Amino acid sequence: MQDQQKLARQSEAKQYVSSMNRAQQAFYAEYASFASTIQKLGIGIKSETENYSYSIVLSNDNRWVQAIGLAKRDGLKNYTGIVSLIKSPNDESTSTQSRLCESNQPSKELPGTPTPTNSPDIQCPSGYSDVLK
């Protein structure tokens, strides 16, 4: 696959997953919970495109949500976004933090689930690196 084509296809996934992260933060601010489906986010993102399939994984305790952009074509990297709850040590307020991660190598395998901490430093799953904004 030509580099320009590959970068353009990967750009779609970066934008979609990043948009899902932002939408989850807005959804949490309004409903005090995360959306369990892409449709509930109401941002017009399809769950399937020619290059990627998109999904949401919600933690059992509603402390984090993971958006996944899984490559459907060889040679493309996967993307995952994580939005996690952070409790303030000074009071009992809760805020959200997000991170966008890219697979280190092209893959069609699902990413691992995040290991959330109570700090703003959300870790990318194993085999993934932070996408700098």
Question: Where do the language-model regions lie?
Answer:
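Amphipathic alpha-helical segments typified by the pilin-like N-terminal helix
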Residues: 1-15, 21-23
